């Protein structure tokens, strides 16, 4: 609710940064999980860069914090351990290999499905890691597993 009593649009909410841990800890483990403003996220430290995203895969809610990080076409991706979906760490795009059925001998190429996984901002200050949730106005497929119906279903089972 806003100060005037009107409901706040969750798509336009401004989120504050939340301290999720120490830089030394994530550099050792290369990943950590946290709850930021009631949203589960995973934070990765890969090749000197920090990345944060919703913890559950956009496809079927798989646990991304248990996946491997691999490079596909020069882009670091988390590979969902359930169905091997590839998600770029930097943008949240889902990647797939395209095959030309008219030329089966051609080498498959990596293509984007678009942004499927919500990405969040990571900052470091005085050795502490902070995550700020995305307030991008578009919907991502991973939003289903981070909010609303899925959380209600999950908690009631």
UniProtKB/Swiss-Prot annotation:
Q: Report the cofactors.
A: [2Fe-2S] cluster
For the modification N-acetylmethionine, the affected residues are 1
Q: Organism's domain of life?
A: Eukaryota
InterPro entries, alphabetized: Rieske_2Fe-2S, Rieske_2Fe-2S_sf, Sol_Rieske_ferrdox_dom
Q: Locate the residues binding [2Fe-2S] cluster.
A: 57, 59, 80, 83
The Swiss-Prot or TrEMBL record annotates one GO molecular function as: metal ion binding
Where the record annotates domain Rieske, the positions are 16-94, 17-131
Give residue numbers for the modification (Phosphoserine): 6
User: Per the annotation, how and in what number is the cofactor bound?
Assistant: Binds 1 [2Fe-2S] cluster per subunit.
A Pfam family the protein falls into? Rieske_4
Q: Is Cell inner membrane set as a keyword in this record?
A: no
Cited CDD domains: Rieske
Keyword annotations for this protein, in alphabetical order, are:
2Fe-2S, Acetylation, Iron, Iron-sulfur, Metal-binding, Phosphoprotein, Repeat
Gene3D superfamilies for the chain? Rieske [2Fe-2S] iron-sulphur domain
Give the protein's recorded name.
Rieske domain-containing protein
């Amino acid at each position: 609710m806003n100060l005037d009593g009107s409901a706040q649009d969750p798509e336009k909410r401004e989120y504050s940064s939340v301290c999720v841990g120490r830089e030394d800890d994530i550099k050792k483990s290369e990943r950590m999980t946290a709850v930021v403003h009631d949203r589960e996220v995973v934070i990765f430290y890969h090749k000197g860069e920090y990345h944060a995203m919703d913890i559950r895969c956009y496809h079927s809610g798989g646990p991304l914090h248990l996946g491997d990080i691999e490079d596909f076409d020069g882009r670091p991706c988390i590979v969902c351990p359930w169905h091997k979906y590839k998600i770029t760490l930097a943008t949240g795009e889902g990647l797939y290999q395209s095959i030309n059925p008219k030329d089966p001998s051609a080498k498959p190429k990596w293509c984007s499905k678009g942004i499927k996984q919500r990405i969040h901002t990571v900052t470091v200050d005085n050795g502490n890691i902070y995550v700020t949730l995305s307030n991008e106005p578009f919907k991502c497929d991973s939003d289903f597993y981070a909010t609303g119906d899925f959380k209600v279903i999950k908690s009631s089972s």
